[in-house]
Regions:
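Short Asp/Glu-rich motifs
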Residues: 49-50, 104, 133-134, 186-187
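Hydrophobic packing residues within well-ordered alpha-helices of enzyme cores
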Residues: 51-54, 111, 136-139, 167, ...
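Glycine/proline-rich, positively charged
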Residues: 11-14, 18, 28, 32, ...
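Conserved beta-strand edge residues that scaffold enzyme active sites
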Residues: 44-45, 128-129, 154, 180-181
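N-terminal binding-site loop/beta-alpha segment at the start of enzyme catalytic domains
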Residues: 1-64
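Short active-site oxyanion
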Residues: 36-37, 122, 219-222
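Conserved, mostly hydrophobic/aromatic
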Residues: 5, 38, 51, 66, ...
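Structured C-terminal cap/extension of enzyme domains
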Residues: 31, 144-147, 162-260
Length: 260
């Protein structure tokens, strides 16, 4: 499992040169730490353009895994995808996802045709905030994409019941979004002492603790925390290092957070 980089809110900084430089520094640190997947969407304001500007200045690293979304009707999808590629400055995406299942059947037609023509590596569909799980399950059963993106963290665990087992069964890669509940979980845990047994899995901070829980689920491929700070980026990336919790420690982790 790996730690990717989300861009919701944190990279929506407009044309501000100082804030763009901060985002560029985060991306440089991300690639320097071996990072690959960067995820964005047309819904995320200026995030796509900020990513593209940073890639133009940093140079496109060979390990980049470019992930974006189509967030419109199928009729408008090709034009939106072309604009997204222009903003990123890429000729071909590694992954394009149907954002929040918008017109998913026809948008998947578009993405599957792009993949068949060699213009796209992988297809995906997304949901978030625990919504529309039944519909996502239908997609996974009827037209399994290469990737699904869904909300999963140490508190929001509904997907453990059906969607994560189904992803393993169907060979679908899983991207976990909202790993920190948009910062609420680290804020809630800040100042609380780390349990001594966390040393067994090389954890010393709460963000590491939260990410290791997610990454250790056997169905999860990557988690995509978003940040605009280099120190937080490095802390997040470190969660993929060292031993991962087994099933018994995962239960202990969830119980510990629940009881705090």
């Amino acid at each position: 499992p790996a730690v990717g980089l989300g861009s919701w809110i944190t990279f929506n900084v407009g044309d501000d040169p100082k804030l763009r430089a901060e985002c560029r520094a985060v991306m440089a640190a991300f690639f320097g730490a071996g990072g690959g997947m960067i995820d964005s969407s047309p819904m995320y304001g200026s995030s796509q353009a900020v990513i593209g500007d940073a890639l133009a200045k940093l140079g496109r690293p060979p390990g980049l895994f470019s992930a974006d979304k189509v967030w419109t009707s199928a009729a408008n999808g090709p034009a939106q995808i072309a604009e997204t590629a222009r903003r990123w400055g890429v000729g071909r995406f590694d992954l394009l996802q149907v954002h929040n299942l918008w017109d998913w059947e026809r948008n998947l037609d578009t993405l599957e045709a792009m993949k068949a023509a060699g213009r796209l590596r992988y297809t995906g569909v997304t949901t978030s905030h625990g919504r529309r799980h039944g519909e996502l399950e239908t997609v996974m059963q009827r037209r399994p994409p290469d990737f699904v993106q869904l909300t999963y963290n140490i508190v929001d665990r509904e997907v453990e019941r059906r969607l994560l087992p189904l992803a393993r069964e169907r060979g679908i890669a899983v991207i976990a979004n909202r790993p920190f509940q948009r910062g609420r979980l680290p804020d809630r845990l800040a100042g609380r002492p780390m349990p001594g047994w966390a040393r067994e899995i090389d954890v010393s901070t709460w963000p590491q603790f939260l990410l290791k829980f997610i990454l250790s689920h056997p169905a999860v491929t990557t988690a995509i925390p978003a940040t605009s700070r280099v120190d937080h980026l490095r802390e997040n990336k470190s969660a993929a290092l060292g031993p991962m919790p087994d099933a018994a420690i995962r239960r202990r982790m969830a119980e510990h957070v629940r009881d705090l």
